[in-house]
């Protein structure tokens, strides 16, 4: 069976970590080897860039374009050094976020032109597209409330409600325009979200469990 690149997307507080735990449980049950990773981050250099973007300790504003380029520098490291090699070896890759998050957060939220982001993906990631995107949709107010229970808000989580409304809109537009993305209502119970994820994976891997 050809390796798959599966990405979980969604706003902060949508429950991506929980969703990934369900994907892991499913793949392990079916004896499918996989690595689990995240963005921003995923490699040592990419994690350093993540810390700079999310927890800027310097008395210097990060411009929206700079934020995008720092995230993409980390994404190139992540893709070239971890994602692509694993897929070539026949290992499935499950990632908490990929380039859709840049389209939504830096594009929708920050207002960077989406064409610029697509160009980065085409030029530096060979136009890489996940085999499956599971988008967890949640109202930004509920998402931020959930995120605040986990810990102190990071630099992006402090961006404000309108930022997240714009971000959500781009996510939903991306799902509508994609043939390999499925939206799940993340406000539903954990049990219902788990059930839907298993059904999606059954269909994707052609399993009947």
Curated annotation (Swiss-Prot):
What catalytic reaction does the record list?
dTMP + ATP = dTDP + ADP
Listed under GO cellular component are: cytosol
Segments spanning the bilayer are: none
Spell out the Pfam families in the cross-references.
Answer: Thymidylate_kin
SUPFAM superfamilies named among the record's database cross-references: P-loop containing nucleoside triphosphate hydrolases
Q: Which GO terms describe its biological process?
A: dTDP biosynthetic process; dTTP biosynthetic process; dUDP biosynthetic process
- Quote the PANTHER family the UniProt record gives: THYMIDYLATE KINASE (PTHR10344), UMP-CMP KINASE 2, MITOCHONDRIAL (PTHR10344:SF4)
Give the family this protein belongs to, as stated in its UniProt record.
Belongs to the thymidylate kinase family.
What is the name listed in the Swiss-Prot or TrEMBL entry for this protein? Thymidylate kinase
> Which gene produces this protein?
tmk
